[in-house]
Amino acid sequence: YPHNSDWDYIAKLMNDPTWHSKNMHKYFKRLERCEYIPKWKFWSRLWSRHGFDGWLPTSIGDSTMLRQDKVLKKLIGAAFKESISESWHTTPNPIKRIFRIILKLRSRLDPNHWRLIRRNLEGLSSIPVTIHQGRRAGTREYLQRVRKEFPDNLVIKANTLVQRVLLDEHNKAYGVEYSIGPHQYRADPKHRKADTFKAEKAFVEREVIISAGAFNTPQLLMLSGIGPRDELEEHHIETKVNLPGVGKNLQDRYEVGIVSKLKENIPLIKGMKLRPPEAGEEAD
């Protein structure tokens, strides 16, 4: 779950209190089905502010597996010791030091625990995953389940690329123009310039929701005439709405991978193939 400061910054920037972190956290609770805090732990459920009735199952790895692997147990122990040491030296107040350590332990190193989110505590934590009974359970699986239950209400088209959003004279979206065929996107290594695809249109009675990712969402808006006028005119696109911010200020958090060579092998993952099993083959 993001830092509260991320949501609060957007709320301030847009002058829209609905983006405030306390309000946005309600949506997280609506979609989450936390499976690693049992029902009988009433106070843990209450203080963590997780969601327990949503469609997205969340779980954490079984810590008892550490008992099977002394090397992995040693690594986790060293990481925890370093995390505690860092927190101890960066927090001047000794009472706050102890409080932070206790808070980490009481929250089971859960990065989605509300108290940790609110204080933005750094250091060692568990990694929540969207897995249910050993199988991946994300947006894809949810959509497939809904399509199976309500085939008349949800249609999913594969190999389909939206070209632009259709806007009326009042710049209200009333549909999309799209084409069907594989490898249409030019960034696809299998894309061929010679291929042609028939354009089709789909119309809506309510609204068009654009959810195409950090890069394709602004691209689709600009192809539809929504974006900085100078750039749209450069590509001979009629400007419907002049919004200079579209396609700008794309940011992400830094991720730095660290590769280390261990003196000892990790027994727990010995023999793992790290790939889907073949037909008749047992999974890792």
Give each language-model segment a name.
Residues 1-284:
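Structural core of flavin- and non-heme-iron oxidoreductases
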